[in-house]
Regions:
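Residue-level recognition of alpha-helical structural elements
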Residues: 186-190, 209, 227-231, 253-257
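Flexible secondary-structure boundary motifs
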Residues: 192-229
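Composition- and surface-driven signal marking solvent-exposed, interaction-prone regions
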Residues: 177, 194, 210-214, 251, ...
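Histidine-centered, metal-coordinating catalytic motifs and their short helical/loop contexts
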Residues: 229-255
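Short alpha-helical scaffolding segments that buttress acidic/His motifs in well-ordered protein cores
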Residues: 174-181, 195-198, 217, 242
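Generic structural signal for hydrophobic core residues of well-folded globular domains
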Residues: 181, 185, 198-205, 220-221, ...
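Short runs of predominantly hydrophobic/aromatic residues within well-ordered alpha helices
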Residues: 171-174, 187-194, 198, 210, ...
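Charged, non-catalytic interaction/linker regions at domain boundaries
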Residues: 1-189, 266-293
Length: 293
């Protein structure tokens, strides 16, 4: 994607409300309020086009749910001197979903600020739609406002989070699963993909997966005691739902999917704040109350 952009990359974020007019995320990256409306509608023509021209009218608009329209409310700018600009934009958008509003999406990327695109000649403007599919399992937040405090959290952690995604395939899978799970059209596949991410992080072997994964997750998230035991039992029950989904037995509910999203979100947040993906040895030492040093 970076090949399309010689200069700055502007990612248009939807479903987010910035509290400040603009905010410096560090490393030259900024986010600021903007407005643009991205739309796409299916239209049918009834005659072939002449050479090097368009289909002649009349045209008819197609009805249905496949049209797309969204308001872009924030312009995330990744400067030209940064490598992997699109990957950085994806990481920050993932953190906006994780920490502020799970409905946040990168609707489009452009090579100019969205406020000035209307004045850029057509042959110079590049606008590429990105996340345009409907969300089949939409997650939402009671508050979609990106406060200064929540943006400070992203500022403090996006560089290390991007490095973890680049270095650890299991963490990259977890980030992808929680980011794309809402767009998967099959509920069983959502549940299986979320658990695949958890297993990649917490399964040292294929033996006794249910107990091992649930015990390691609980020991990672809770100190020894009653809360760790209670969490292990809850996670083990969720794992049963994963198994039924994987074997085509729809004995799970929407709440089970939501609970698994929240479990993975909690794990990812802990990894981000620790700036470290735990090794299998560290997890097993933690399980038995040993020092990881």
């Amino acid at each position: 994607m970076d090949d399309f952009f010689d200069g700055d990359l502007h990612a248009g974020i939807s479903n987010i409300v910035l509290e400040p007019e603009d905010f410096d995320l560090g490393e030259g990256v900024t986010i600021r309020k903007t407005y643009a409306h991205l739309m796409a509608h299916f239209v049918m023509a009834f005659a072939p086009p002449p050479p090097n021209s368009f289909h002649p009218g009349p045209w008819k608009a197609a009805k249905g749910t496949s049209s797309f329209a969204v308001d872009i409310a924030a312009d995330l700018c990744i400067p030209s001197d940064r490598e992997k600009r699109f990957s950085i934009a994806q990481t920050i958008a993932f953190m906006l979903r994780l920490g502020i509003n799970p409905a946040a999406v990168v609707a489009a990327v452009a090579n100019h600020p969205f406020t000035s695109l209307k004045g850029v000649p057509d042959n110079e403007a590049i606008i590429i739609p990105i996340e345009t599919l409907p969300r089949m399992f939409p997650l939402s937040s009671e508050n979609d406002v990106a406060t200064v405090e929540s943006l400070e959290w992203i500022k403090d952690h996006w560089v290390s989070t991007h490095a973890l995604i680049q270095e650890y395939p299991e963490f990259a899978l977890a980030a992808a699963a929680i980011s794309t799970g809402q767009f998967v059209h099959n509920a069983a596949l959502i549940l299986v993909s979320l658990w695949a991410a958890l297993e990649a992080l917490f399964s040292p072997s294929t033996a006794e997966l249910k107990f091992r994964v649930s015990a390691l997750i609980a020991s990672y998230l809770e100190p020894p005691g009653e809360e760790r035991y209670t969490l292990q039992r809850r996670v083990a029950k969720l794992y049963d739902k994963r198994s039924s989904a994987a074997h085509g037995q729809p004995s799970f509910r929407s709440q089970d999917i939501l609970d698994t999203f929240n479990l993975l979100r909690r794990v990812i947040t802990s990894i981000i704040e620790n700036r470290h993906v735990p090794t299998k040895e560290e997890l097993e030492k933690r399980l038995f109350g040993c020092s990881s040093g």
